[in-house]
């Protein structure tokens, strides 16, 4: 899955949620706001956004951070949301009964969400640079 010339500044930690009962379009609207943010900043943004997609995404970020802490012993304060993907999952097909024996089709979409966190070392990393954004400063790769 990963290329041989991976120049990431630290280890990657991933968490995957499959078959989440929401459309991928609605999840992408939330995901685009937290891409590139630090762990604490991403959770703060998700708490304040008024969308239903924020709850499963914040659970997934908590899970990825817990994986980083438990499996690799990393500090949660040094984590960065480096890559986030939302893919469409299977569509559940249902039928809404209507008058005179008819049935209208109902499609219930699902999505798969992948979150990759990276550890950043802010003191001696020439690959990272500070970038000013509306919500404060964010560490990004050059």
From Swiss-Prot:
GO terms for molecular function: rRNA binding; structural constituent of ribosome. It is found in: Plastid, Chloroplast. The keyword rRNA-binding applies. GO terms for cellular component: chloroplast; large ribosomal subunit. Signal peptide: none annotated. GO terms for biological process: translation. Keywords: Chloroplast, Plastid, Ribonucleoprotein, Ribosomal protein, RNA-binding, rRNA-binding. This protein binds specifically to 23S rRNA. HAMAP family: Ribosomal_uL22_B (MF_01331_B). Part of the 50S ribosomal subunit. Belongs to the universal ribosomal protein uL22 family. This is Large ribosomal subunit protein uL22c. It comes from Picea abies. The gene is rpl22.
